[in-house]
From Swiss-Prot:
Native organism: Radianthus crispa (Leathery sea anemone)
PROSITE patterns: BPTI_KUNITZ_2
Name of the protein described by the UniProt record: PI-stichotoxin-Hcr2a
Similarity-based family: Belongs to the venom Kunitz-type family. Sea anemone type 2 potassium channel toxin subfamily.
Keywords assigned by UniProt, alphabetized: Disulfide bond, Nematocyst, Protease inhibitor, Secreted, Serine protease inhibitor
Positions bearing the site annotation: Reactive bond for trypsin: T14, A15
Transmembrane segments: none
Length: 56
């Protein structure tokens, strides 16, 4: 879906939430640290959920 094409957005806050986003350049769900606010509409806590939604 189109949410899988959104870029990774860490956000300006300083929390530490391990998340996954779909990297459209590599075609893989990639880990990153989300700061806890002002992210995009799709970040996932679980690798398997990212893979299922984005078919990675």
């Amino acid at each position: 879906g189109s949410i899988c094409l959104e870029p990774k957005v860490v956000g300006p806050c300083t929390a530490y939430f391990p998340r996954f986003y779909f990297d459209s350049e590599t075609g893989k769900c990639t880990p990153f640290i989300y700061g806890g606010c002002e992210g995009n509409s799709y970040v996932d806590e679980k690798l398997h959920a990212c893979r299922a939604i984005c078919r990675a």
